[in-house]
Amino acid sequence: STLGTTILLSKIAKLFPPGVINVINGDEKIGMALNSASLVRSISFTGGGNVAKLIMKDAAKNLKRVQFELGGNDPAIILEDLDFDKYMNRIIDGTFTRAGQVCKATKRIYVPEHRADEFFEILYKRLNEFKIGYQLNPESNMGPINNKNQYNFIKSLGAGLIANNKNAYEVGQSIDDYWQ
């Protein structure tokens, strides 16, 4: 699901002689075939830890070089004296850049309890001003979700909060249900 990145990488690979760098997108079947092929000497994988363990185990049989970019779980820690108006855009960018689908995206925000209402009031206001659209359009704040699985995962996070009697706020506007 990192198709955009690999397309860009394939364009960069054209700067090298043919066969030096090969970029192939595919599902598990293609990935495992490449992983077990003796001609493949190096594997770069972006994804989750469970799949990375399988790749590493299989790659070890032929002592292949491996490089992983695994999903992060990064917090934003808000200090007592933070000027919310001044820094809220940085917090939002850290959370929603590429629709939040980057490994270093902020997954949770810790706010001093006595400032939580103030923080979330400003955050809620700014997020309601978001415009979802084509990511290269300067008027858009955020592009679309990368794939249906990610979309469903995000929806399940909100449902889980509600099921556990936590506060969940829906902000922004809905776009057509692309995945139906």
What are these regions (language model features)?
Residues 6, 23-41:
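A structured beta-alpha segment of the ubiquitous adenosine-cofactor-binding alpha/beta core
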